[in-house]
């Protein structure tokens, strides 16, 4: 869904809101693509947090190298 959104989205600060409105109104099923993309991203981060919680529960933080690589990947994912 991100590829279809990227075809119509304009990152310019002046026209960004207009391009989102264009996606929702003028693109066939654009509102659905935007909705699926937003909910898919939310689900991705929920799964990410569950994975961190599982690592904390099972004591994976004691493996410092593995844990630090995971934290770096988390920060890079959010950046």
Curated annotation (Swiss-Prot):
Gene Ontology molecular-function annotations: metal ion binding; ubiquinol-cytochrome-c reductase activity
Record: residues binding heme b b562: 37
Entry's cofactor comment: Binds 2 heme b groups non-covalently.
Any one annotated GO CC term: mitochondrial inner membrane
Pfam families according to UniProt: Cytochrome_B
GO biological process: mitochondrial electron transport, ubiquinol to cytochrome c
Transmembrane segments annotated in the record for this chain: 1-7, 31-52, 67-79
InterPro entries, per the entry: Cyt_b/b6_N, Cytb/b6-like_sf, Di-haem_cyt_TM
Localization (cell): Mitochondrion inner membrane
Family annotation (PROSITE patterns): CYTB_NTER (PS51002)
Residues binding heme b b566, per UniProt: 51
Cofactor(s) the protein needs: heme b
Primary site of residence: mitochondrion
Job description of the protein: Component of the ubiquinol-cytochrome c reductase complex (complex III or cytochrome b-c1 complex) that is part of the mitochondrial respiratory chain. The b-c1 complex mediates electron transfer from ubiquinol to cytochrome c. Contributes to the generation of a proton gradient across the mitochondrial membrane that is then used for ATP synthesis.
Extra remark beyond the main annotation: Heme 1 (or BL or b562) is low-potential and absorbs at about 562 nm, and heme 2 (or BH or b566) is high-potential and absorbs at about 566 nm.
Name of this chain's protein: Cytochrome b
Organism: Dipodomys heermanni (Heermann's kangaroo rat)
């Amino acid at each position: 869904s991100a590829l279809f959104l990227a075809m119509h989205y304009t990152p310019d600060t002046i026209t960004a809101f207009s391009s989102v409105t264009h996606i929702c109104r003028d693109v066939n099923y654009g509102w659905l693509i935007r909705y699926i993309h937003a909910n898919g991203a939310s689900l991705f981060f929920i799964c990410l947090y569950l994975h961190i919680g599982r690592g904390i529960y099972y004591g994976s933080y004691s493996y410092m190298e593995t844990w630090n690589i995971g934290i770096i990947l988390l920060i890079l994912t959010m950046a």
